[in-house]
């Protein structure tokens, strides 16, 4: 029997969530899921929830939860609501009792070794390794005997053995015959919960309208839809995006520490560059720098996500970070400049941003224009530079000052091209390349410029 998932009425304000397990640092692949959810919610005026799936007490750590919250704030997508599953055990226990009462949750007593033996025998007979539901045949006396032997049951959800269908936001029409699946264990023998049941309970309680996650959860979806319905709820819309892989085809994992968001942040990668790469790779859009998260949100479209793996090359991030800085408006940089003690306002930022590979380099350019420094003055250029210094106009200086000054220096010295510009740049900055001198001169001021042209520290 086939039955499509009942659909919710389209809400005016969608609710989406990102649900990491705090068992390690999140990487750029996790960021892809978080960003797609957050930006879809933001664009529609909806709610973005951060849910920590921390029911595995042995592996979950508070410091990882804190790091994840820090990473989302760095990306510019702080959640509207945050909660931990470990604070909601009572709700999961209530759902467990409801499923037991309706006959959908049943106790099973096999050990892992016994289950593995069953699977090996099934494979030897060319049968799929699906749980045989032997526990359903146990009598009350059988269960009492097993428990007297010290066995404690784990609890399985009895699937309907039907075809579950849904319209996936990325993959289109999907269907899974749950007869091909083992009845999933929802509660371990020690009473702790696996991922599946708490996720459904929370999505119902929080009014989640859309679940957008990696394609490795496609099969889970059919199981979860049955649990939604068994609890008397309506399943949200589902969308399963492609996963990021390295150019080699290797999948991303938490063990690749250099791709964690904290490592990328410490390496000086721009959050907006990381966001653009995470969201746009593996879509119909080119991976390019964007001016803002709002601009990136406008490019998020589930229909534009490819079904093929998304190849992510970490080496491309450096160039994307540079391009992001080159187009970053002053308003986006202002607070960071102030925090670093960098002045000069919009004039300074527009002068130097095109020469930045990392934001931290702005401090070097600020030191160059605001603090004493010695330029590079060749002995053969001293006369020329002295003439140039003598032709410096009085202040105040503006954007036209440099052009007028160069015109006068060229006329007086007869120099042109590299012979004109190169000695001036070396004397003023000590560097072969850099921002336009026309923009730097007003920031440096007449006294500093004259001093460096004279070969001094100014």
Swiss-Prot record:
Stored Pfam families: Anticodon_2, tRNA-synt_1c
InterPro entries tied to this protein: aa-tRNA-synth_I_cd-bd (IPR045462), aa-tRNA-synth_I_codon-bd_sub2 (IPR020751), aa-tRNA-synth_I_CS (IPR001412), aa_tRNA-synth_I_cd-bd_sf (IPR008925), Glu-tRNA-ligase_bac/mito (IPR004527), Glu/Gln-tRNA-synth (IPR000924), Glu/Gln-tRNA-synth_Ib_cat-dom (IPR020058), GluQ/Sye (IPR049940)
Protein's UniProt keywords contain Ligase: yes
A cellular-component GO term for this protein: cytoplasm
Placement of sequence motif 'KMSKS' region: 251-255
Location within or outside the cell: Cytoplasm
Annotated positions binding ATP: 254
Assigned EC number: 6.1.1.17
GO terms, molecular function: ATP binding; glutamate-tRNA ligase activity; tRNA binding
Keyword match Nucleotide-binding: yes
Annotated keywords: Aminoacyl-tRNA synthetase, ATP-binding, Cytoplasm, Ligase, Nucleotide-binding, Protein biosynthesis
Broadest EC class assigned to this enzyme: ligase
GO biological process: glutamyl-tRNA aminoacylation
Catalytic activity: tRNA(Glu) + L-glutamate + ATP = L-glutamyl-tRNA(Glu) + AMP + diphosphate
Positions of short motif 'HIGH' region: 20-30
Function: Catalyzes the attachment of glutamate to tRNA(Glu) in a two-step reaction: glutamate is first activated by ATP to form Glu-AMP and then transferred to the acceptor end of tRNA(Glu).
Family: Belongs to the class-I aminoacyl-tRNA synthetase family. Glutamate--tRNA ligase type 1 subfamily.
Self-association and partners: Monomer.
Protein name: Glutamate--tRNA ligase 2
GN (gene name): gltX2
